[in-house]
């Protein structure tokens, strides 16, 4: 069980004499969930949802492979193709591999429809959430599949690959006059069987053996005679799986990155590839290497940001469409009902090569800010709040001897701190993690919420302590007081800047360090400092006036776009 925690976490727990087994059992761990969920978006009507529920209930003690085999056989019999040689081989191979047992099968199986995936839906419903999470195998709704395949035209001779095809959604939905031009790879033998069955049903007028290989696309070597042999590739690769692949192509621990890069190299020049990715590929630091790969090839031509979701997946997701080796000067972005174009230069604004999807007016504002800026927070002092290791034991709700107040992120508001609700005995040696004392005891410092999609900074000149839900900044910007820096960070313009450049749900030191600051004269510095004092000590609201000054500093005459 201990393998699911990091070495750093284990060291911290050892230091605090934590019972690791009890701690792990108390953690919410989706990978161990035994819950079953039916992905209803894959079916057309409620009758089939009820039928799947009945099958699961009646065959709750049966093995998954036995249930899938018998339902597949019923589907094939419904179309009168079960006696074809190629179909018999598919059934016999699966029967032999899984030692399929006969079932007293209950359930009236519907006729096959290319508009839904009954067999794949049943399989997903039979798998526990924990198993799907470990595999990263959540199948893609046809609505999204169809959108990703739009513009793919195989005709009679062009070929298509799905390198992690699951039950075959992309293979079923792409249009071709020759099913032998369709290729899929899937390492789950049950899913690969379903994909084969779905294809022979979808192309029941053809006598053929589907080109579905049951193997691991990343680990099992080369499946094809030569590189650059495919015209089209599209898929939804596993997300969240850490890859153990050692590749000469790219250095990454994310499996979806390896799926993409290996697929890209199997695509011919001029071929098209469309991948479904977690939205985090746009901005998270750990995905910088794949963004650099994409930028270097300069053939990404479309990003589609989806507002929908599908069963089992809470992560926001996007699709990226590439036209290999065809230079693209900009990238079309589709977002809800909006369409706009982003220049590749927008991907170079940050050190981590964040894909900032800026509309033209937004990019104009960003460029103006960058052109006026000469400083950053990179030379400032930073610290984390205290990690006690046991808040229940070490935090007190009332004051007492040797105790002092300690603030949490919940008490941080723009500019000011609410009253502290907790007290602590400041014994540095007893804490799991603690910063230098002179940081906490600084004459003045800024504190900010760490888990937030908003920049919320407060001023502290009371040398107070803070828990780790708050982080600490002692800024060093030439010509600016600490309070003036506070004014900039709490402004609408800097909120806009942070959102557009980084798009994070957390306020990270690395991102804050890159925020650009202008050179200002002493008059503006004094003016902003005075306004912050009026907020801190006079109870006045000076946000509007602060915003107006900062807009003027950057010569932005129409701030409505950032509000």
List where the protein language model places each region.
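Active-site-adjacent bridging/hinge elements
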Residues: 42-52, 116-128, 239, 243, ...
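Non-catalytic DNA-recognition/assembly elements of restriction-modification systems
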Residues: 347-391, 410, 519-563
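Class I S-adenosyl-L-methionine
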Residues: 74, 78-149, 494-501, 509
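Conserved hydrophobic/aromatic pocket- or pore-lining residues that grip, position, or stack substrates
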Residues: 122, 148, 195, 448, ...
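Polybasic, glycine- and aromatic-enriched phosphate-binding surface used to engage nucleic acids
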Residues: 1, 267, 364-524
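Charged, often flexible domain-edge or linker segments that flank or initiate folded functional domains
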Residues: 1-97, 137-138, 144-220
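Signature of N6-adenine DNA methyltransferases within the class I
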Residues: 1-11, 143-144, 165, 171-172, ...
């Amino acid at each position: 069980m201990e393998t699911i925690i990091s070495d750093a976490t284990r060291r911290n727990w050892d230091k605090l004499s934590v019972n690791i087994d009890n701690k792990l059992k108390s953690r919410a761990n989706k990978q161990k969930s035994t819950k079953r969920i039916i992905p209803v978006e894959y079916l057309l009507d409620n009758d089939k949802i009820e039928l799947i529920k009945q099958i699961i209930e009646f065959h709750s003690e049966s093995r998954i492979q036995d249930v899938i085999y018998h339902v597949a056989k019923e589907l094939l019999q419904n179309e009168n193709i079960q006696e074809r040689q190629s179909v018999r081989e598919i059934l016999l191979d699966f029967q032999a591999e899984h030692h399929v047992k006969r079932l007293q099968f209950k359930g009236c199986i519907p006729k096959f429809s290319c508009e839904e995936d009954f067999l794949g839906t049943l399989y997903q419903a039979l798998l526990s959430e924990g198993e799907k999470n470990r595999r990263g195998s959540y199948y893609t709704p046809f609505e999204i599949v169809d959108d990703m395949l739009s513009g793919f035209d195989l005709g009679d001779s062009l070929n298509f690959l799905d390198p992690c095809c699951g039950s075959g959604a992309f293979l079923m939905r792409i249009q071709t006059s020759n099913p032998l031009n369709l290729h899929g790879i899937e390492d789950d033998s049950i899913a690969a069987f379903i994909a084969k069955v779905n294809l022979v049903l979808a192309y029941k007028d053809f006598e053929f053996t589907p080109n579905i290989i049951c193997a691991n696309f990343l680990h099992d070597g080369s499946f094809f005679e030569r590189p650059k042999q495919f015209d089209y590739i599209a898929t939804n690769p596993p997300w969240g799986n850490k890859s153990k692949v050692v590749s000469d192509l790219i250095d990454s621990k994310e499996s979806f990155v390896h799926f993409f890069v290996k697929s890209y190299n199997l695509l011919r020049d001029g071929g098209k590839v469309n991948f479904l990715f977690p939205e985090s590929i746009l901005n998270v630091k750990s995905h910088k290497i794949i963004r650099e790969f994409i930028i270097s090839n300069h053939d990404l031509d479309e990003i589609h940001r989806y507002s929908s979701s599908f069963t089992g997946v809470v992560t926001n997701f996007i699709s990226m469409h590439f036209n290999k080796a065809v230079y693209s000067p900009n990238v079309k972005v589709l977002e809800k009902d909006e369409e706009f174009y982003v220049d590749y230069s927008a991907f170079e604004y940050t050190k981590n090569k964040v894909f900032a999807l800026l509309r033209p007016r937004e990019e104009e504002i960003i460029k103006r800010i960058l052109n006026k800026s000469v400083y950053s927070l990179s030379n400032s002092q930073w610290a984390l709040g205290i990690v006690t290791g046991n808040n229940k034991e070490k935090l007190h709700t009332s004051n007492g001897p040797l105790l002092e107040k300690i603030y949490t992120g919940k008490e941080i508001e723009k500019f000011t701190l609410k009253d502290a609700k907790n007290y602590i005995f400041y014994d540095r040696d007893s804490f799991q993690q603690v910063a230098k004392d002179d940081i906490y005891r600084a004459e003045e410092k800024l504190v900010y919420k760490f888990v937030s999609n908003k920049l919320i900074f407060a001023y502290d000149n009371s040398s107070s302590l803070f828990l780790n839900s708050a982080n600490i900044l002692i800024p060093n910007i030439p010509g600016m007081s600490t309070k003036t820096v506070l004014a900039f960070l709490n402004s609408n313009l800097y909120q806009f800047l942070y959102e557009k450049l980084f798009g994070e749900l957390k306020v990270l030191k690395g991102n804050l360090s890159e925020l650009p600051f202008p050179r200002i004269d002493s008059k503006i510095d004094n003016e902003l400092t005075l306004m912050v004092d009026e907020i801190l000590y006079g109870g006045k609201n000076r946000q509007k006036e602060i915003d107006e000054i900062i807009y003027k500093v950057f010569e932005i005459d129409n701030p409505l776009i950032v509000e």
